[in-house]
Design a protein with these regions (language model features):
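Generic detector of multi-pass transmembrane helix bundles and their immediately adjacent loops
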Residues: 185-256
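Soluble N-terminal domains of membrane-associated systems
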Residues: 1-97
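C-terminal ends of transmembrane helices
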Residues: 105, 149-162, 210-222
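Core alpha-helical transmembrane segments of integral membrane proteins
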Residues: 113-190
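Alpha-helical transmembrane segments and their cytosolic membrane-interface
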Residues: 73-126, 131-140, 230-239, 250
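Catalytic cores of large soluble enzymes that bind and process phosphate-bearing ligands
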Residues: 5, 22, 26, 77-80, ...
Length: 256
């Protein structure tokens, strides 16, 4: 195996790891996919180290090592990309793709974009469903739907302008709490506290928290702590938005 081929394999392995990490895969999956791809392409050994903002990968072939580093920029959770990358790796393992074909497939990957208004509607519907499950009447469900849908629209607009995620979460929580808080201020529905609590459920960073726990349990402690820290900061931003909205409405407590 010549060094040029090894360099090409190193590049595709680190690109694979980077794509998975950027789109929300847990650390064990990222490392395993990079290693499996390298071995399938004829590399003796692939070592991969992850940090919150970088991927470090080394390939070994005939006692010759090549190491490369790529900066990690979070692109949001997207399981479609993660699944497509895994399919490419499996295809290489089954000798359906060679190096050049696998590289072309990776280069052509594009994120699946849902219609933004469909996302707004579904977010509103899901939060309203939680309100219904919590015992809210139709008035509470309607208020929750409106508050969460408008908050999601605002979140999309702010995110398009690439604001800091902490600011995005704070403003989104502020908008949702301000609208749903009207039900508590003017005693609308059977239990206004349900609307206030359900309308901000779109901001719960459940996936990062689950991934952080999975990383820690599987030995990737630094990645687990990093992801847990990010999720905690985002939750803090949401709390700030809720507190500001409640203060503006002069609501002392939202506990029923």
């Amino acid at each position: 195996m010549d060094q040029e081929y090894q360099r090409a394999v190193t590049r595709i392995c680190v690109e694979t790891a980077l794509l998975l990490l950027q789109h929300g895969a847990e650390s064990a999956v990222v490392v395993q996919m990079a290693q499996r791809l390298g071995v399938a392409l004829g590399i003796e050994s692939v070592e991969c180290a992850l940090t919150a903002n970088a991927v470090l990968l080394t390939t070994l072939s005939k006692q010759h090592c090549i190491t490369t580093v790529r900066k990690n920029v979070d692109k949001g959770i997207n399981m479609q990309i993660v699944t497509d990358v895994q399919h490419i790796v499996v295809a290489v393992e089954h000798h359906l793709y060679d190096l050049s074909m696998a590289q072309k497939k990776l280069d052509k990957l594009k994120s699946l974009k849902y219609n933004r208004y469909l996302v707004v509607f579904m977010i509103g519907l899901s939060c309203a469903s939680f309100a219904h499950l919590s015992g809210g009447d139709m008035t509470i469900c309607a208020i929750t739907f409106i508050a969460s849908a408008i908050a999601m629209f605002v979140r999309q607009e702010i995110s398009k302008r690439h604001y800091n995620p902490l600011i995005v979460f704070a403003i989104t929580a502020f908008v949702a709490s301000l609208i749903s808080g009207m039900s508590l201020k003017y005693s609308l529905g059977n239990d206004p506290h349900i609307a206030l609590a359900s309308s901000v459920l779109l901001l719960v960073p459940g996936f990062p928290l689950i991934n952080s726990l999975a990383d820690i349990l599987k030995g990737y402690v630094n990645m687990g702590i990093g992801r847990w820290t990010i999720a905690t900061v985002l939750t803090f931003g949401a709390c700030l938005g809720i507190v500001f909205a409640l203060n503006l409405l002069n609501i002392v407590s939202w506990v029923g």
